[in-house]
Amino acid sequence: MGKKSRVKTQKSGSGGASTAVSPKEMMNLISELLQKCSSAASAGKEWEEYVQIRGLVEKIRKKQKGLSVVFDGSREEYFSDLMAWAQENGGPSEGFCVSDFGSEGYGLKATRDIKAEELFLWVPRKMLMTVESAQNSVLGPLHSQDRILQAMENVTLAFHLLCERADPSSPWMPYIHSLPQEYDTPLYFQQEEVQLLLGTQAIQDVLSQYKNTARQYAYFYKLLQTHPAASKLPLKDSFTFDDYRWAVSSVMTRQNQIPTEDGGRLILALIPLWDMCNHTNGLITTGYNLEDDRCECVALQDYKENEQIYIFYGTRSNAEFVIHNGFFFQDNAHDRVKIKLGVSKSERLFAMKAEVLSRAGIPASSTFALHCNEPPISAQLLAFLRVFCMTEEELKDYLLGEGAVGKIFTLGNSEFPVSWDNEIKLWTFLETRAALLLKTYKTTSEEDRSLLEKPDLSLHSRLAIQLRLAEKQILERALASGRAKRLHFEKKLEEDAPLPRYEESDIALLENSQSKLPIILRQLEEVEEGQEVPEEEEEEEEQHSLLLNGQKEAYGVKEEANGEETQEEVRGDVDLDSMEKGQRESAELTASRTEDKTEE
């Protein structure tokens, strides 16, 4: 098994490697990058900051040209080694093979008929790359002494992958050979391709992802040069930005949670072979068998011989798929647009509204979502908007009135309006909000559709335009839904229709209908909806605090260093707490589901 010449230094065109750069010159550039990435951008200056950070990164990449490690041969040449390695280590020996599916990339193809719910793929723990295997590897000594590696499992996995890639005798080499040499995440976009996302709801996550990655790279470059525990790492003499970008993307597109060996907690892992499966709509069909100590996957549906085998990655939005997985899923039943909403602390009724929201289990400032289907808002967002639009008398009724405790259960139930006027206000707000958000885009939906018809459009440009078009379509549907609901309730008010009243006996209805669950049960599919907005972002939220007068939204996400000292030679250059916070923001959505990985 294996190829004669496994690893080589990357060729840099006809010119080969660049002229040697002095360590001092490189360290000066790295220090400048670290300093730039460790401060928060001023509101509205996020793009300008991105351009500056990218400029520094490109200077570093130019000086590192020719120093990155790649493998001989094509990726496809190594798939037979991957299958043989899996069989040798207790994995499946038949039923599927790795195949090229054109625009979908590589995936798994059935080599026989497979029945729905049939166990067709299993991966023993010894094949997995995990945080535990990293701690037991050459990376262990540095991991035990570095706070960032300890706090961020995804970064630990990235370094584990780099260290094993640099070791020709690594037991995971057949898996590492099978990984793509480049990805389609925004970390690989050209600046003009990222620019296509300006004005979208996704742009801030894209910019933060790049900034966090650059900051981590600069921090660890300095650490590898100065920390005694790094002296034996194979990365010490060659650690390029391209290498780190590749490792981060490999982990970001593939990381999954599995139990530790004792089953006591969940840790991040890379799952060879299984992560070749592409995504489709459906249900989670993968789990971990603690008794047999292996990851197991059953078929999502019946598959005929030669058909592609799909799995369901989870309820991700297309923004999450593009940013964290590098693809756009056209028929995404779970697509949505994130919006940050909050009750202004300067509002006269803030305390009363915050109290009603608190009783319903909803923060006064939170992240919600507008969905691609009907209704466009969740029960939690409906409850928030109802409270936001309440008059003082309505607030008193929900705080002190007869049956106040029971009424909290109705806030997210569309069948029990607070009042016709309240419904008109909240749907008017949704209509206005969606219209304002649509005005922030630089192109129309029709213009985006025309652009997507161009045959010479780059893949990354296509992803960016598909994503911004999908956002607009969700907002357009929300606007139309808001208008229809507003007109409906205006008619109810005009007709003086009787208002449905909640009775204690209605609790059975609330508890037995998935769409009418009491808000306090917090049963939400999307992990990000309803998260409390951190205090450092509340000042920004004041700028777009749901005022019904149509105030335009500001789109910055603050990152604030707290000035805490760092360790070793990196002291004073970067705030570790800020770094941890930034990376958690970019990884939060990828580390919480069983089947969140890339489409090949």
Residue ranges, per PLM feature:
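Signal peptide-directed extracytoplasmic domains
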Residues: 139-140
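Long, positively charged leader/targeting segments at protein N-termini
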Residues: 2-127, 132-135, 163-600
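E2/UBC-UEV (E2-variant) core
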Residues: 145-161, 338-341, 349
